[in-house]
């Protein structure tokens, strides 16, 4: 559960991420594909090379979804319901991959905002991404 301080940290972080969410999403995907090559199996039709238009487009989807989630911290299940259905029923993504992408997102945000990525912000963003992952995998059962 996100505390009021966690929510404030997430809102502040996404305020700084601002218009870079799509770029950070793409960068995090690239990090994930390089660091965890088995994740590439979900994207056999993608050009996974650095800077690929397909990775950038999917990074935008990731960034947009996280921005929407950050705007709806008190009702993540409703905000992410369609995305949860998609990942559970159509794409059938292994839930462990959300944890891997979350890690890569944290690394990406830390790399771009080292002065703002305090231990408290790190913990709050980690909790937020864990909550998002939990919602996205909630319909697998």
From Swiss-Prot:
The modification Phosphotyrosine is found at residue 24. Keywords: Acetylation, Heme, Iron, Metal-binding, Oxygen transport, Phosphoprotein, Transport. The modification Phosphothreonine is found at residues 108, 134, 137. GO terms for cellular component: blood microparticle; haptoglobin-hemoglobin complex; hemoglobin complex. The modification N6-acetyllysine is found at residue 16. CDD domains: Hb-alpha-like. The modification N6-succinyllysine is found at residues 7, 11, 16, 40. The modification Phosphoserine is found at residues 3, 49, 102, 124, 138. Signal peptide: none annotated. Residues 1-141 form the Globin domain. Heme b binds at residue 87. The keyword Phosphoprotein applies. InterPro entries: Globin, Globin-like_sf, Globin/Proto, Hemoglobin_a-typ, Hemoglobin_oxygen_transport, Hemoglobin_pi. Red blood cells. GO terms for molecular function: haptoglobin binding; heme binding; iron ion binding; organic acid binding; oxygen binding; oxygen carrier activity; peroxidase activity. GO terms for biological process: hydrogen peroxide catabolic process. O2 binds at residue 58. PANTHER family: HEMOGLOBIN FAMILY MEMBER, HEMOGLOBIN SUBUNIT ALPHA. Heterotetramer of two alpha chains and two beta chains. Involved in oxygen transport from the lung to the various peripheral tissues. Belongs to the globin family. This is Hemoglobin subunit alpha. It comes from Lama vicugna (Vicugna).
């Amino acid at each position: 559960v996100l505390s009021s301080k966690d929510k404030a940290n997430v809102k502040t972080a996404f305020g700084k991420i601002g218009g870079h969410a799509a770029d950070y999403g793409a960068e995090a995907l690239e990090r994930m594909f390089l660091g965890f090559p088995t994740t590439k199996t979900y994207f056999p039709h993608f050009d996974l090379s650095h800077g690929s238009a397909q990775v950038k487009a999917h990074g935008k989807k990731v960034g947009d979804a996280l921005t929407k989630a950050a705007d709806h911290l008190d009702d993540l299940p409703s905000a992410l319901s369609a995305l949860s259905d998609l990942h559970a029923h159509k794409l059938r993504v292994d839930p462990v991959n959300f944890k891997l992408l979350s890690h890569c997102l944290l690394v990406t945000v830390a790399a771009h905002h080292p002065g703002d990525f305090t231990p408290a912000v790190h913990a709050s963003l980690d909790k937020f991404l864990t909550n998002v992952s939990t919602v996205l995998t909630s319909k697998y059962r």
